[in-house]
Amino acid sequence: VSCTGSKDCYAPCRKQTGCPNAKCINKSCKCYGC
């Protein structure tokens, strides 16, 4: 998922992992587990 900031990643990562833990790194989302 492309992003401009970490908050762009929270919703897609919550869908993937069930948790909104995420960071935007090099304009793409990195999802972390709970």
Curated annotation (Swiss-Prot):
Result after altering K15Q: Induces a change in the third and fourth disulfide bonds, leading to disulfide bonds between C-13 and C-31, and C-19 and C-34
Keywords: Amidation, Calcium-activated potassium channel impairing toxin, Disulfide bond, Ion channel impairing toxin, Neurotoxin, Potassium channel impairing toxin, Secreted, Toxin, Voltage-gated potassium channel impairing toxin
Residues carrying Cysteine amide: C34
Subcellular location: Secreted
Pfam families assigned to the protein according to its UniProt record, in alphabetical order: Toxin_2
Tissue expression pattern: Expressed by the venom gland.
Resulting phenotype, G33A: Induces a change in the third and fourth disulfide bonds, leading to disulfide bonds between C-13 and C-31, and C-19 and C-34
Effect of K23A: 1000-fold decrease in affinity for shaker B
Cellular component aspect of the GO annotation: extracellular region
InterPro entries named among the record's database cross-references: Scorpion_toxin-like_sf (IPR036574), Scorpion_toxinS_K_inh (IPR001947)
Gene3D superfamilies assigned: Knottin, scorpion toxin-like
Chief subcellular location: secreted
Disulphide bonds in the chain: C3-C24, C9-C29, C13-C19, C31-C34
SUPFAM superfamilies: Scorpion toxin-like
Annotated site residues (Basic residue of the functional dyad, critical for activity) in this chain: K23
GO molecular function: ion channel inhibitor activity; potassium channel regulator activity; toxin activity
Residues flagged as site, Aromatic residue of the functional dyad: Y32
Swiss-Prot/TrEMBL domain comment: Has the structural arrangement of an alpha-helix connected to a beta-sheet by disulfide bonds (CSalpha/beta).
Function of the protein: Blocks voltage-gated potassium channels Kv1.2/KCNA2 (IC(50)=0.12-0.8 nM), KCa3.1/KCNN4 (IC(50)=1-2.2 nM), Shaker B (IC(50)=2.39-80 nM), Kv1.1/KCNA1 (IC(50)=37-45 or no activity, depending on the study), Kv1.3/KCNA3 (IC(50)=150-180 or no activity, depending on the study).
Family stated for the protein in its record: Belongs to the short scorpion toxin superfamily. Potassium channel inhibitor family. Alpha-KTx 06 subfamily.
Note: Negative results: shows very weak or no activity on KCa1.1/KCNMA1, KCa2.1/KCNN1, KCa2.2/KCNN2, KCa2.3/KCNN3, Kir2.3/KCNJ4.
Full protein name: Potassium channel toxin alpha-KTx 6.2
